[in-house]
């Protein structure tokens, strides 16, 4: 029984329980905030929402927060 206790102690020292992700550490899904981050033609008049493309006079490709939003020119 003491061997099992030693093994358990070694395992807990090498891999503590705090290393496991807890529910409080995970991000919460917030669909309302995602909708605010969405690119819309109201915010960007050169953006054509149907084609996901930029209109004339826009520089391409266009990125928003390191995400490609317009690739056709």
Curated annotation (Swiss-Prot):
Give the chief site where it resides.
secreted
Keyword tags = Cleavage on pair of basic residues, Disulfide bond, Neurotoxin, Secreted, Signal, Toxin
Q: Give start-end of the signal peptide.
A: 1-19
Q: Which Pfam families match?
A: Conotoxin
What else does the entry mention about this protein?
Found in injectable (milked) (IV) venom. Surprisingly, the propeptide sequence 36-49 has been identified in the venom. It is unknown whether it is a by-product of incomplete enzymatic degradation of the precursor, or if it has a biological function on its own.
Q: Which organism is it from?
A: Conus consors (Singed cone)
> Which tissues is this chain's protein expressed in?
Expressed by the venom duct.
Reading the lineage from the top rank, the first entry is Eukaryota
Q: What is known of its domains?
A: The cysteine framework is III (CC-C-C-CC). Classified in the M-1 branch, since 1 residue stands between the fourth and the fifth cysteine residues.
Q: List the disulfide bonds.
A: 53-72, 54-70, 60-73
Give the GO cellular component terms, alphabetically: extracellular region
**Protein name per its UniProtKB record:** Conotoxin CnIIIE
What InterPro entries does the annotation carry? Conotoxin
